[in-house]
Curated annotation (Swiss-Prot):
PANTHER family: UPF0297 PROTEIN YRZL. Pfam families: IreB. NCBIfam families: PRK05473.1 (NF003997). Belongs to the UPF0297 family. This is UPF0297 protein SPD_0180. It comes from Streptococcus pneumoniae serotype 2 (strain D39 / NCTC 7466).
Length: 88
């Protein structure tokens, strides 16, 4: 499959947005509880897809794996842009 010069639209199901946000908050807390740097661990997971970056503690690994990594990235970008005052 080759790349195209046409812009491709990507759409995340709106019902997942809140769930992803809550999951990231829970995973962050679990990583923090275990003494990890939560940001580094979440970034490692998102970039690599390796679930070993997230512990099984408090079911964090299973929680984050419920979502595709692109869905997580979309929610992170949306949250960041809203924080910067961008009207989405």
């Amino acid at each position: 499959m080759g790349f195209t010069e046409e812009t491709v639209r990507f759409k995340l199901d709106d019902s997942n947005k809140k769930e992803i946000s809550e999951t990231l908050t829970d995973v962050y807390a679990s990583l923090n509880d275990k003494g990890y740097n939560p940001i580094n661990q979440i970034v490692g997971y998102v970039l690599s897809g390796d679930p070993a970056y997230v512990p099984r503690y408090n079911n964090a690994r299973n929680q984050i794996r419920k979502y595709e990594r692109d869905e997580i990235v979309e929610e992170l970008v949306r949250y960041y842009l809203k924080g910067q005052g961008v009207d989405l």
